[in-house]
Amino acid sequence: MSTRFQEHYQSKVVADLIAKFGYKSVMEVPRITKVTLNMGLGDAVNDKKIIENAVGDLTKVAGQKPVVTKAKKAIAGFKIRQGYPIGAMVTLRSSRMYEFLDRFVTVALPRVRDFRGISGKAFDGRGNYNIGVKEQIIFPEIEYDKIDALRGLNISITTTAKTDEEAKALLAAFKFPFRN
């Protein structure tokens, strides 16, 4: 089952990127390999319900159960012991990834307060893009009445692009609303 974004990539994006960058093979064209959603929950040390609620929110947003991340080492200043649950993350690939990106670009991003576009400078130098979301309520799957606290999450989009310019062209072809 291919999604709307997958069909858009195969029918339009590949041809556009070959024309723009002059790739010799279709396999050279950059593609999105995975999307990772990460929610850091430092305040979960005192309350275990926070982790459960965050896992529930991420499950609704991603459509897949996240893994609870645990502290690698103890940090006395933050009252964290090794092995304490301090976050949740989920990695999306193939059709779930494209479905999430479709919902993120078309539904969630326009719901951000005072939204003027996403930064074009958040690339890491190797063609990957990171975006932070301050509130999980921008996603339509999250019901405002049922959340206990506003939590942000980090979205990492990993691509096969060699440069930031190629990655930006790829994401722009997927209608990512860049500011500049």
From Swiss-Prot:
GO-annotated molecular function: rRNA binding; structural constituent of ribosome; tRNA binding
Annotated GO CC locations: ribonucleoprotein complex; ribosome
SUPFAM superfamilies for this protein: RL5-like (SSF55282)
Keyword annotations: Ribonucleoprotein, Ribosomal protein, RNA-binding, rRNA-binding, tRNA-binding
Keyword Disulfide bond applies: no
Pfam families to which the protein is assigned, alphabetical: Ribosomal_L5, Ribosomal_L5_C
Function: This is one of the proteins that bind and probably mediate the attachment of the 5S RNA into the large ribosomal subunit, where it forms part of the central protuberance. In the 70S ribosome it contacts protein S13 of the 30S subunit (bridge B1b), connecting the 2 subunits; this bridge is implicated in subunit movement. Contacts the P site tRNA; the 5S rRNA and some of its associated proteins might help stabilize positioning of ribosome-bound tRNAs.
Official protein name in the record: Large ribosomal subunit protein uL5
Species: Polynucleobacter necessarius subsp. necessarius (strain STIR1)
